Swiss-Prot record:
Induction: Negatively regulated by microRNAs miR156. A motif (Bipartite nuclear localization signal) lies at residues 111-127. Residues 1-17 have a biased composition (Basic and acidic residues). The SBP-type zinc finger is required for the binding to DNA. A zinc finger (SBP-type) spans 51-128. The lineage of its organism: Eukaryota, Viridiplantae, Streptophyta, Embryophyta, Tracheophyta. The keyword Transcription regulation applies. Binds 2 Zn(2+) ions per subunit. Trans-acting factor that binds specifically to the consensus nucleotide sequence 5'-TNCGTACAA-3' of AP1 promoter. Binds specifically to the 5'-GTAC-3' core sequence. Promotes both vegetative phase change and flowering. Regulates phase-specific patterns of leaf epidermal differentiation and flowering time, but does not seem to affect leaf shape. This is Squamosa promoter-binding-like protein 3.
Length: 131
């Protein structure tokens, strides 16, 4: 057995190399197109959320200058911290943990996080102290 290979066996033909390069370019073009599409979708989503309105009935707060957090959750700063608000005819409060409005019955006294989330938080705290 010889360690030497013929030129035909040891080297790829120029045609094979150019075909591979074309395939790579096509793949790169597809990836770029998909990235551009994703970016466009992301930008479209941002445009609609920046002109949001507070969820609370009869709230006329200007959300265009609100923090991104408040725009994302469609709640003005005042109502995010209010002890109770009226949404769909129900008295509710904004939960800081869930970033949603819940019925007042889901909160303990004047707390701003619902019982369910507070229970999970307390459970995690207890586990870390016993370790």
């Amino acid at each position: 057995m010889s360690m030497r290979r013929s030129k035909a066996e040891g080297k790829r033909s120029l045609r094979e190399l150019s075909e591979e390069e074309e395939e790579e370019e096509e793949t790169e073009d597809e990836d770029t197109f998909e990235e551009e599409e994703a970016l466009e979708k992301k930008q479209k989503g941002k445009a609609t959320s920046s002109s949001g309105v507070c969820q609370v009935e009869s709230c006329t707060a200007d959300m265009s200058k609100a923090k991104q957090y408040h725009k994302r959750h469609k709640v003005c700063q005042f109502h995010a911290k209010a002890p109770h608000v009226r949404i769909s005819g129900l008295h509710q409060r904004f939960c800081q943990q869930c970033s949603r409005f819940h019925a007042l019955s889901e909160f303990d006294e004047a707390k701003r996080s619902c019982r369910r989330r507070l229970a999970g938080h307390n459970e995690r705290r207890r586990k870390s102290t016993t370790d």
